[in-house]
Structure formats: structure tokens, C-alpha cells
Amino acid sequence: MNRLEKLLKKMTLREKLAQMVQVLPFVFTDDVDRNSLTGPLKELNVKQEDLYNIGTVYPALNVFDSEIILNLKKQYFEKNPHGIPLLVANDVVHGLRTIFPIPLAISCTWDPKMAELSVRVAAVESYAVGIHVTYAPMADLVRDPRWGRVL
């Protein structure tokens, strides 16, 4: 039995389900009323220990501060019962610190090198602040006439 199989065998169903959840970082702070910000956590029976089984955090705010992200990862890792690291994800559709035109605009240039450069810069900047997963590049193939403009 390999390491992954052993880990999955040790994990409860609740822990496995929590790995598929993504939250904002403030749920890990003690000075925030989680129920007023994230909905009915009590009704859903979400406990404090469940937070340290959650798979992904989406730091919409303070995304440029690698120290905040690193501290959050350390706090999570120390309290995760199985030593599973926290994934950090963010929308990096057209850059992180360096902002490029949206993908639709870059495609209008017919310049593949510009497209490659923009995603390469976004990847380097994301990695530098501790982001593991970027929701980009993306292609919204919208065929609904109610959606006149999309990225």
C-alpha cells in the first residue's frame, strides 16, 4: 500500500469532503464572527477542527503579501491532523501584480509571444507569494445571448 492509499484509509469521510472545500482566509482568525460572514456554519455543523481539513484557501485580499500567506500555511499545517498542506488558489486571469490586458484583448493582438509572456509573468509572481493554483488561463465559451461580455 503506497503513502496516498494509507493516508486515504486513515481519513474520515468528513475529512475527505473537507479537502474539496475552498474558503477565504478570515475563517482561520479568531477575531471574526464567522457566522455573520460565511453563512450558517452552526447549521452546517462546521467545527473549528473542520477548518484544518479544508483543502484550499482563496486569499482575495492581501494576495500580494507572501508573509500573510506563509503564516496561514504554517498555522494550517501545524493543526492539520494528517500533515496535508493547504493549497492557495487565486484568480490570476490577466496578471497578479503586473496587470496585462484580459485574454480576449491579448488574443486580438494575434501575438502568441505576448500571450505567453503575460502568463509566464503571472506564474512567476503567483509562485513568489505562495499561490499554488491559478484559475487561469481560462476560456469562457459563452453562447447565451444574455451574456454580452465575458472575459
Q: Predicted segments — roles?
A:
Residues 1-151:
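N-terminal beta-rich core of secreted/periplasmic extracellular enzymes
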